[in-house]
């Protein structure tokens, strides 16, 4: 039948046979009647049968289609294609939905979300990550979208820092008005090769007290071509809280936030799962490595009636020293990584 609206399937479960002569649908000429009647002959009826309606088809062919080796623009930090597709799928990427990646990099998550039909946008503190070395977004992330004929799924990418985002945030966390994203998917930087940084200066109070703008040849420094904004070290734990806070202020009701978080296998809560009262953790998938692992955390944006009248905004207390400045002090996982994840008593 062609063009059927509904498909039905029958599954049969058969018992394993020890007969080396059993062939489905045929009877070899050298098999005797005694063999057929023997105890080890193939059963004549299945153990169980299942009858059901076909509601969806597998998309495993997308894994080979999106193989990183076939992409024109990648980097050493590009997320594995299968994991990116799983992330976008768990975040419910689909037609008519707007998805955002605040750490876009080479756009692997955006491509996966666009494959499922979503309209995607991204940002990164370093514009070179999504546009290449001065080549432009068309030859960077855009080349990957063009490679899969998904140009319609790419909105744009901007240079931005999640803690200083120019995007609209809902003023009230208790009302849906002002929230506009249907999904957020990302793989935040772990800060291992170099410490995490955000826009700003180490001593922001001193900088804020300076009068006027810094001028060069009569032009504000930040308006000149090639301007590079100053950056300061930042805590990995606080960044996780920032991601949840950003999601709570931008995701519509029941929308999803999905991101990856590294953790040491024997950690005792130092890097526990971040929480926010406006977000419900619904999935926690673990990818183990040798001495560490990373988790795919998926949250659902709670509806107005599911949140208490006066919830605590920060759902988790961060135990950080107030004078933390170095990359290791701001990122406990980075410190453990370079210590080889040895127990504290084994560290000199």
Place the predicted regions along the sequence by residue.
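Class I S-adenosyl-L-methionine-dependent methyltransferase catalytic core
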Residues: 3-348
């Amino acid at each position: 039948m062609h063009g059927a609206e509904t498909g039905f399937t029958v599954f049969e479960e058969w018992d394993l046979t020890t007969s080396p002569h059993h062939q489905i649908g045929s009877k070899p000429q050298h098999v005797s009647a005694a063999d057929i009647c023997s105890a080890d002959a193939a059963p004549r009826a299945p153990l169980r049968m299942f009858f059901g309606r076909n509601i969806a088809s597998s998309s495993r062919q997308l894994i080979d289609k999106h193989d990183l080796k076939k992409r024109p623009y990648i980097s050493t930090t590009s997320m594995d294609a299968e994991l990116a597709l799983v992330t976008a799928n768990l975040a419910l990427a689909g037609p008519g939905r707007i998805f955002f990646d605040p750490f876009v990099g080479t756009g692997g998550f955006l491509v996966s979300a666009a494959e499922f039909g979503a309209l995607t946008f991204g940002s990164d503190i370093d514009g070179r990550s999504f546009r290449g070395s001065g080549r432009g977004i068309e030859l960077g992330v855009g080349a990957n979208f063009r490679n899969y004929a998904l140009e319609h799924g790419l909105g744009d990418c901007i240079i931005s820092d999640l803690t200083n985002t120019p995007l609209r945030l809902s003023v009230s966390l208790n009302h849906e008005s002002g929230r506009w994203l249907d999904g957020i998917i990302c793989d935040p930087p772990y800060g291992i090769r170099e410490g995490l940084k955000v826009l700003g200066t180490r001593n922001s109070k001193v900088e804020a007290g300076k009068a006027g703008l810094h001028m060069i040849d009569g032009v504000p420094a930040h308006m000149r071509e090639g301007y590079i904004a100053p950056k300061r070290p930042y805590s990995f734990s606080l960044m996780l809280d920032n991601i949840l806070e950003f999601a709570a202020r931008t995701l519509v009701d029941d929308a999803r936030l999905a991101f990856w978080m590294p953790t040491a296998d024997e950690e005792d809560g130092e890097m526990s799962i971040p929480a926010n009262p406006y977000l419900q953790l619904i999935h926690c998938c673990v990818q183990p490595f040798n001495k560490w692992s990373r988790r795919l955390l998926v949250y659902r944006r709670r509806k107005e009636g599911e949140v208490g009248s006066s919830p605590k905004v920060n759902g988790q207390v961060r135990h950080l020293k107030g004078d933390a400045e170095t990359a290791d002090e701001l990122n406990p996982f980075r410190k453990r990584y370079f210590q080889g994840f040895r127990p504290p008593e084994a560290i000199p």
